[in-house]
Amino acid sequence: MGGKKKPTLSQLAKKAEKEKAQQAQKAKKEVKKEETPAKRTIQVLDEKVFQAIAKEVQNMRVITPYEIASKYGIKMSVAFKVLRNLKERGDLVLVAKGHRTEIYVPAKRS
C-alpha cells in the first residue's frame, strides 16, 4: 500500500540548510537575551523611597501613578498606594478619578 516516500537528495539538503539557519537564529536570540538585563521593579516600598517621592511630588504640576511607577521603578499598585497615602496625609489633592487612574496635584497648588 505505499506509505511515505523517501525525500530526494535536494530535499534533504534544503532541510539540513533550514535546520542550520534556525539553530543559528536561536543562538543569536539567546545571546541577545543575556545582554539585556531585566528591569527590576520594587514590590515593597521602604521609607527612604517614600520620602523621596513625597519630596519630588511637591514640585510636579500633575501627578499620576504611571509617572511615579516609571520614574522610581515601582509597581503600579504600589504607586497607587503611595499616592493615596500622600492624599491622606494632606500633601496631595485628588483632581480626577477615572476607571483606571487617578490624577493628583500638590496641596499648595490647588
Curated annotation (Swiss-Prot):
Cross-referenced Pfam families: Ribosomal_S25
UniProt-recorded Gene Ontology molecular function terms: structural constituent of ribosome
UniProt keyword list: Ribonucleoprotein, Ribosomal protein
Domain of life: Archaea
Single GO cellular component term: cytosolic small ribosomal subunit
Residue numbers spanned by region Disordered: 1-38
Compositional bias per record (Basic and acidic residues), positions renumbered to this chain: 14-38
Family note: Belongs to the eukaryotic ribosomal protein eS25 family.
Protein known as: Small ribosomal subunit protein eS25
Native source species: Pyrobaculum aerophilum (strain ATCC 51768 / DSM 7523 / JCM 9630 / CIP 104966 / NBRC 100827 / IM2)
